[in-house]
């Protein structure tokens, strides 16, 4: 079961991540081209950059990534659960329950954590530009030379590609797994969750140890001493356990003594 679930997850993940990366690269390009380099000096660089980043535009882009990926994948999972467990199909809650619940989840998530998330992204972008500026201080650049060099550097795709890739991967995992969590919650069927990852040399040791861990649907996984509802759970997890995570989880429906599904309603 775990191999099949993970392979399906990664296939979807790679496709969604590519779409997310395009959106994030376009946003980074727009943000960096909008910086006021004419007013930039060694002393005021950080403040000028922070003040010129359009956090609302950045937030809209990341929300779009989370919503479009989560809605698409969550709908797929909801349909897949019904396909795998066709018994008493009419008792399953209809898909609009998922759509409404996922949208509500994202609205509440961004209301609570959106400011911190976007501020973190803008600070990451600022730090990258400031680090590039500092390179010239050892070469006795004039302010004019520094401005010219920074303008050329930050407008190269390679400058922000790594950051964009990290964000795309993190957001894709968050959107997919949070949507899968909600698809299970709104199904109307009692299930258990199983943490699924790959010990391929790239995975965190804490996630390797979590592989195969099984909990009830309304319970939390214990990963690296942290409680999380699902892989990439930023509400409860730490950056150490969520950034760049490629893990997922699977569902196993609970059954009664006759082998039938157990419905919550």
Regions found by a protein language model. Give the residues of each.
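Acidic, glycine-rich two-metal-ion catalytic cores of nucleic acid-processing enzymes
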Residues: 159-265
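N-terminal leader/targeting and assembly helices and adjacent pre-domain segments
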Residues: 1-158, 252-265
């Amino acid at each position: 079961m775990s191999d099949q679930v993970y392979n399906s997850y990664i296939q979807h993940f790679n496709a969604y991540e590519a779409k997310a990366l395009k959106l994030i690269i376009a946003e980074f390009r727009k943000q960096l081209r909008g910086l006021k380099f004419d007013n930039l000096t060694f002393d005021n660089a950080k403040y000028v950059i922070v003040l010129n980043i359009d956090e609302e535009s950045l937030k809209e882009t990341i929300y779009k990534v989370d919503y479009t990926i989560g809605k698409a994948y969550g709908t797929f999972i909801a349909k897949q659960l019904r396909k795998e467990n066709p018994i008493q199909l009419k008792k399953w809650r209809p898909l609009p329950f998922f759509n409404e619940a996922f949208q509500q989840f994202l609205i509440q998530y961004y209301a609570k954590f959106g400011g911190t998330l976007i501020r973190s992204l803008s600070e990451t972008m600022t730090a990258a530009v400031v680090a590039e500026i500092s390179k010239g201080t050892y070469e006795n650049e004039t302010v004019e030379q520094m401005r010219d060099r920074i303008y050329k550097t930050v407008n190269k795709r390679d400058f922000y590609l790594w950051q964009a890739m990290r964000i795309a991967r993190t957001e894709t995992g968050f959107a997919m797994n949070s949507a899968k969590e909600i698809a299970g919650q709104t199904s109307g069927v009692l299930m258990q969750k199983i943490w699924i990852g790959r010990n391929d040399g790239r995975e965190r040791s804490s996630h390797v140890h979590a592989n195969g861990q099984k909990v009830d649907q309304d319970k939390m996984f214990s990963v690296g001493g942290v409680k999380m509802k699902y892989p990439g759970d930023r509400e409860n997890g730490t950056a150490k356990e969520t950034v760049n995570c490629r893990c997922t989880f699977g569902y196993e429906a609970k059954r009664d003594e006759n082998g039938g599904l157990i419905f919550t309603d």
